[in-house]
Regions:
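Conserved structured catalytic cores and adjacent interaction surfaces
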Residues: 11
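Vicinal oxygen chelate
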Residues: 15-20, 32-33, 37, 65-69, ...
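Core segments of cupin and vicinal oxygen chelate
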Residues: 5, 14-66
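Short, flexible turn/loop "capping" segments at secondary-structure junctions
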Residues: 1-5, 88-90
């Protein structure tokens, strides 16, 4: 029997300039207002890149588009999955999160 589709809860986009991206999404799609935050050690901890410990910083911004959280991520200092993504693939979709069904 087919399982019900898992609903999308979050879409994360890696960007070079978070303020320019917030402005562009606001103007083009009406997304906002944005809640901006900075993640850095020590609150950002137990982070790894390719199985090795790493410390990094990032700036994030979130807004709701209906039931979906749209998150923009601007890499900061230190090696991270977000900085690597930006350097190798450029700006764009990084991940989509879904709500898992519970039994």
């Amino acid at each position: 029997m087919p399982q019900e589709p898992m609903p999308i809860s979050q879409i994360a986009i890696v960007v070079k300039d978070i303020h320019a991206a917030m402005d562009a999404y606001q103007k083009a799609l009406g997304w906002g207002p944005w809640n901006v935050y900075e993640h850095k050690p020590p609150s950002l901890h137990h982070t790894e890149l390719h199985g090795e410990p790493t410390d990094y910083t990032m700036i994030g911004a979130e807004t709701h588009v209906g039931p979906i959280v749209v998150e923009l991520i601007q890499p900061g200092e230190g090696p991270s999955i977000y900085k690597e993504w930006l350097e190798t693939k450029g700006e764009g979709l990084h991940h989509i999160a879904c709500m898992a069904h519970t039994q």
